[in-house]
Amino acid sequence: MKRAFKGGAPKERTVRVMTGGAIESIQRPVIIRKTPVVWGIPCDEIMYSKFFQYFIKHANYMPWDGWCFTEDTYLPKARNFIHNAFLLESTMPYLLMMDSDIVFPPDLVDRLMAHNLPIVGGWYKDKKKDSHPPVVFDFVPGDDDYLHVVPRQKGSGLERVEAMGAGNWLMTRAVAEALGESPYSLNRGGEDLEICWKLKQLGIPLHVDWDIALAHVGVGVY
């Protein structure tokens, strides 16, 4: 690090990514993030090219960050593997859960960390429903043992919510410890809803930043 920046850190860096058969060159400011994060990527059956294009352009990945992904595509198992690896085999302060079908804007980690919250994420649309509502919810009563939710309307700024998709959220080590090992489960519905319900029972606030718009590949970008 000292050798590389002996003459002072560069102000900008050039990122080159091939998109649509052409090389795209982008000038990005150099931002040194001192706080490490584990990037947890639960892989889908396929890895989307757009994910890697935007990761190279926007991630601002630091040499001291961690990286964890799985070959298993069964989502609860994959998320639990990443969660447990962060909890038991890492000492880093943050885990970023980032699905392989999520495309994200620049400086995502820095923007989420700046909130200094236990767990916070950007938002994206539901690509399975025709109306594509935000994957952000309120819990509602049901007549069985499953977790029932209704989608929220898109808001603005930072908002505390009851539930949201796990495709992009940043949690602190304290939250991971409070949830314990292997907290993801499909027993009562979506594995991310199970986490959100546990957070609610633990009194841990969950927030969405509506200003961080993500793309759910299959819906469209932003």
Could you describe each region identified by the protein language model?
Residues 91-92, 117, 204:
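Short, high-confidence coil segments that cap the C-terminus of an alpha-helix
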Residues 91-103:
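Short beta-strand-to-loop acidic/aromatic patch adjacent to the donor-nucleotide binding site
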Residues 2-73, 77:
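N-proximal low-complexity "stem/linker" segments adjacent to membrane-targeting elements
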Residues 83, 105-186:
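Conserved catalytic core of nucleotide-sugar-dependent glycosyltransferases
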